[in-house]
A protein has these predicted regions:
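Gly/Ala-rich beta-loop-alpha elbow adjacent to hydrolase catalytic centers
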Residues: 174-179, 183
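Alpha/beta hydrolase fold serine-hydrolase catalytic domain that processes acyl esters and thioesters
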Residues: 1-25, 29-93, 98-123, 127-157, ...
Length: 388
């Protein structure tokens, strides 16, 4: 299957003036905010925008001589994506500004964003999804029990700030994973004058929202401009509620790993579309929702705090830390589990069991589909037997 990198090779020479902004461009710019442009791209109102080609050169000069590890679940293809963007006429002259990267491990706050001046009369405000930090993942889980998490509030403030910095310019908002949720939240809760300037909002496998958010007038006003894209075995993107229609796309991965945007199949200026998410993804969604809805908001918050207390008992600050010394981490986690009360421990083990079973079922379902596809292809390619 072709992916984002292939798209940059095949269509990177086509300017936006002749080939308009599309859903694949959106995902590329959503992934771009995972790059650490600190010291390269100015913050909001802090200086002139930097051409993407120059920013890429400065980034690779800064990281020269050392491997670029994006983290356990952040795609390691992102630096290569940046390299190809810098060589592509479609992207290299785009301007970057408004880079923000905020992390507070004590308060479980993680927020990062980047503004791209696309050159077609619109900006793309790219909100970073959940990164490698445990604080970021904890805030992600808080989406299920809090009316507003800190990153959502910061996303609204960021959108207002960049709208003031670029008056009368049309806006696109987007992100991958939690970044997609932040993009929609910012679009819904920004001032009406700013919302009227929004051309589109892109949620790439981002979690949804509580029911009461979907019925708000400001969400209804924006609904037709929200584009939600999920892979065929989506789990993250099916969490909570989506009022808007969503597009299902094919992926080269199986199970939970389909969350990786670099696994999404690209054809021409769009993704390879499917009719619906898989049956196992639907069952996983139902099982997770049923489990979550069985807990009060207070119980959910206590569960999240306990779960991350167990992970942090290993001394890890990131998923990479957990992976680097997994033997030590597992020992610390097991000891921390024993210290939990039985009710919390049972809830945590049940949640892990649901995820494990669901991922296994979705993986097996995907492998079965691939096998059937291969067999059909062989049958179609087999020459007919001539009759004697």
């Amino acid at each position: 299957m072709a992916n984002l990198l292939d798209y940059l090779d095949w269509r990177g020479d086509l300017p936006l003036s002749g080939d308009p902004f599309n859903e694949v461009d959106n995902l590329i710019l959503a992934e771009l905010s995972f790059v650490d442009f600190g010291g390269i791209v100015p913050g909001p109102g802090a200086g002139a925008a930097v051409p993407l080609g120059e920013a890429a050169a400065a980034y690779f000069a800064k990281t020269e001589g050392r491997p670029i590890d994006m983290g356990v679940l952040v795609p390691n293809q992102i630096p290569e994506m940046l390299r190809r963007m810098a060589a592509a006429p479609r992207f290299r002259d785009m301007q970057l500004s408004g880079f923000v990267d905020h992390l507070d491990t004590e308060k479980a706050e993680q927020f990062a964003a980047l503004t791209i001046v696309c050159g077609d009369g619109a900006l793309y405000l790219s909100f970073r999804g959940t990164d490698d930090t445990l604080a970021g993942w904890k805030e992600d889980f808080y989406l299920s029990c809090m009316r507003e998490v800190p990153a959502q509030k910061k996303a609204v403030e960021y959108t207002e700030t960049m709208a003031r910095q670029y008056p009368r310019v049309k806006l696109r908002l987007g992100g991958h994973s939690k970044g997609g949720n932040l993009a929609v939240w910012a679009g819904v809760f920004c001032p009406l004058a700013v919302q009227r300037r929004i051309r589109s909002v892109w949620s790439n496998d981002g979690p949804g929202f509580h029911d009461e958010i979907l019925s708000l007038p400001q969400h209804v006003r924006l609904e037709e401009r929200i584009h939600t894209i999920v892979p065929r075995s989506s789990v993250v993107g099916m969490l909570l509620e989506h009022e808007e229609d969503y597009t299902v796309v094919d992926s080269s991965q199986q199970g939970l790993m389909q969350h990786d945007g670099f696994s999404w199949a690209v054809k021409g200026p769009g993704f390879v579309r499917l009719h619906s998410v898989t049956r196992q993804a639907q069952l996983c969604d139902q099982e997770l929702r049923s489990w979550v809805q069985g807990l009060s908001e207070t119980q959910r918050e206590q569960f999240i705090d306990s779960a991350f207390q167990v992970l942090e008992a290993s001394g890890a600050k990131t998923l990479t830390d957990l992976k680097a010394d997994s033997f030590k981490a597992v020992g610390a986690i097991v000891r921390a589990l024993k210290d939990l009360d039985k009710e919390t421990r049972d809830a945590l083990l049940k949640f892990m069991s649901i995820l494990f079973r669901s991922n296994l079922r979705m993986t097996l379902e995907g492998l079965q589909e691939e096998t059937e596809k291969t067999l059909r292809g062989r049958k179609a390619a087999k020459p007919p037997v001539k009759k004697a």
